[in-house]
Amino acid sequence: MDRGMKSKLYIDKNLQQFDDFKSTLTGDFCNFCADNLPIDNDFEVYVVADREPHGISTTAAYHVGNNKCVIYGKNRALVDILRSIAHEMTHMMQDEMGLIRGHIQDAGGFHEDQANARAGELIKRFAKSMKERKAIYENKNNFRS
């Protein structure tokens, strides 16, 4: 579903596990999340190799009011990176809907519970939507033709 929004995915060149196939899958997943949450405005997703310069203390962060997610990608399986993207994009949806006021607690509570639940749902729905998308669960690209 194209609502005229622009999405940008940036993958750190130091993340050597991202070949063209995984980069394409990641871009497809970001658009899948945007369509299914939904996200109504332009957004950016950064997958980075270093936490500190990007303000990440755990595995990911959402920048409230900027529609920007930053995901730590070093030494993580693709499915875990995608789950983090879906989690932070759920916060993006909450932000667009005006549901975020102030700080979001790190564990528990409405915002985190919804983000965790939606992330799991989006991963499963994406993997089931096309055969080659099941490759998100693999270390190698076993589903390419």
Model-based region annotation:
Residues 1-4, 142:
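Short, Lys/Arg-enriched N-terminal segments with co-localized hydrophobic residues
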Residues 79-83, 95-121, 131:
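Post-HEXXH active-site segment of zinc metalloproteases
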Residues 2, 9-65, 125-127:
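Auxiliary, metal-adjacent structural segments of Zn-dependent hydrolase domains
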Residues 48-79, 92-96:
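Active-site scaffold of zinc-dependent metalloenzymes
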Residues 87, 91:
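Histidine-centered divalent metal-coordination motifs
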Residues 124-145:
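Long, well-structured alpha-helical subdomains associated
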Residues 15-19, 75, 105:
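Active-site oxyanion-binding pockets that recognize sulfate/phosphate
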